[in-house]
A protein has these predicted regions:
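Acidic glycine-/aspartate-rich tracts in secreted/extracellular proteins
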Residues: 74-76, 189-194, 204-205
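Disulfide-stabilized, aromatic/cysteine-rich ligand-recognition loop
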Residues: 89-103, 108-113, 171, 194-226
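Residue-level recognition of short, solvent-exposed, well-ordered loop/turn junctions
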Residues: 179-180, 225
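Short aromatic-cysteine micro-motif
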Residues: 3-179
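Active-site-proximal beta-strands of protease catalytic cores
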Residues: 182-190
Length: 226
């Protein structure tokens, strides 16, 4: 049995599962516009209970089956498909809701990735998978300082350092998962401090040695530029 743990809920830094309620304890996940209007929960308490249950089920599933599935491509308006415009300019709540609609059948649930799942995926890639560097992803991600050009698509060679469609380059993948490193930031369910959710992986505008696949940071869940 593998023991999987994360930082303790109700602490002030990186942690999950937990709510983000602002320094006044009345914002973000306690704002009805978000927890009810967008996510459909009756109360912040119901939202917290759902997060706790989902997290426990995720951990139990990993321990039982030895792993989990990740969408092969970044999220687009059409879902998880190749060759689509990455879905950006949406806040955390909108993307969290979108992630719950991606299951192919009623026997499968789709969720936004948890922080621990992101870390486990990076750990697998660096140690057991294609053994790519997760602390400097300039050689396999779409960053501002990545090396060389991307693959040719539709007869045109496009350089690193600009946003591309999902699954654009065969060089930008690890274990058949595209754009874990760069292209666009990825939101997770991990909470940060009193006012943030965590995003990971860097983007096309970031240095891949400073913002690699393993990088994570907290930002306002109401922001919409990721």
């Amino acid at each position: 049995t593998v023991t999987i743990s994360r930082s303790t809920p109700n602490t002030t830094d990186y942690r999950e599962p937990d709510l983000v309620v602002g320094s006044d304890s009345t914002s973000y996940d306690k704002n009805e516009s978000y927890y009810k209007t967008i996510l459909g929960y009756d109360s912040p308490k119901a939202m917290a209970e759902a997060f706790t249950t989902d997290y426990a089920n995720m951990i139990a599933s990993i321990q039982k089956y030895g792993g989990f599935y990740i969408g092969r491509y970044e999220l687009s308006k059409e879902g998880v498909q190749k060759g689509k415009a990455t879905l950006t300019n949406k806040n955390w709540y909108e993307l969290y809701k979108k992630c719950t609609t991606l299951n192919a059948s009623d026997k499968v649930e789709s969720k936004m990735i948890w922080g621990i799942q992101w870390d486990l995926a990076c750990d697998f890639i660096s140690k057991k998978g294609e053994q790519k560097s997760i602390i400097n992803s300039t050689t396999w991600g779409n960053h501002s300082n990545s090396t060389g050009n991307a693959a040719v698509m539709d007869g045109e060679t496009k350089k690193y350092g600009s946003k591309q469609v999902t699954g654009f380059s065969e060089y930008w993948k690890a274990n058949n998962i595209y754009d874990l490193a760069g292209n666009c930031w990825e939101w997770t369910q991990e909470a940060f401090n009193t006012n943030g959710r965590v995003y990971c992986g860097g983007s096309y505008g970031n240095d891949g040695s400073f913002y690699p696949a393993s990088y994570r940071y907290g930002s306002s869940p109401t922001g919409s530029s990721y």
